[in-house]
């Protein structure tokens, strides 16, 4: 078994079964099951879902959406990524898998916007994201132009 790596998840019934493992692990707002079911096309490779398999099982996942323009108050001009629903199964937490997913997104070299959920602000701070508070809630933003050295070859997946 090789070292786990981040890969784009196919939208298919196998992935749907893998997502069911996450259903009881986190908050309802992290659930991707319904989102996947609504978009199921067998082996669609253009999915917004990314994950890490370990021993043949999905152990961590996130969704990434390309957006056109962030504008105020996010100080994002041009296209950016929205990172949603980052989740690692409890047995595999605190082992760097969440960081691997975020570093995969950072390698795309677009600004990244995310919402800190469930006491995760320390995680985002550690990964050089900056907090932004707006009426809609608290967000975290990462800018590649100010963080060009934030992802090293050793950290990248």
Curated annotation (Swiss-Prot):
One of its GO terms (molecular function) is acyltransferase activity, transferring groups other than amino-acyl groups. InterPro entries: Acyl_CoA_acyltransferase (IPR016181), GNAT_dom (IPR000182), YlbP (IPR017274). Its EC number is 2.3.1.-. NCBIfam families: PRK13688.1 (NF010241). Residues 9-154 form the N-acetyltransferase domain. It is an enzyme of class 2 (transferase). Keywords: Acyltransferase, Transferase. This is Uncharacterized N-acetyltransferase BCG9842_B1219. The keyword Transferase applies. The keyword Acyltransferase applies. It comes from the Bacteria.
């Amino acid at each position: 078994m090789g070292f786990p790596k981040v890969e784009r998840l196919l939208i298919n019934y196998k992935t749907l079964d893998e997502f069911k493992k996450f259903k009881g692990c986190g908050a309802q707002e992290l659930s991707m099951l319904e989102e996947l079911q609504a978009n199921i096309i067998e082996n669609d490779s253009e999915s917004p879902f990314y994950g890490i398999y370990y021993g043949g099982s999905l152990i961590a996942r996130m969704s990434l959406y390309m957006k056109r323009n962030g504008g105020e108050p996010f100080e994002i001009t041009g296209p950016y990524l929205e990172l949603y629903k980052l989740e690692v199964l409890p047995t595999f937490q605190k082992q760097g898998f969440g960081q691997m997913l975020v570093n995969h997104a950072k390698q795309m070299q677009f600004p990244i916007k995310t919402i800190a959920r469930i006491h995760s602000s320390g995680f985002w701070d550690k990964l050089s994201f900056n907090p932004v508070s707006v009426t809609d809630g608290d967000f975290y933003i990462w800018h590649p132009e100010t963080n060009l050295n934030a992802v090293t070859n050793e950290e990248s997946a």
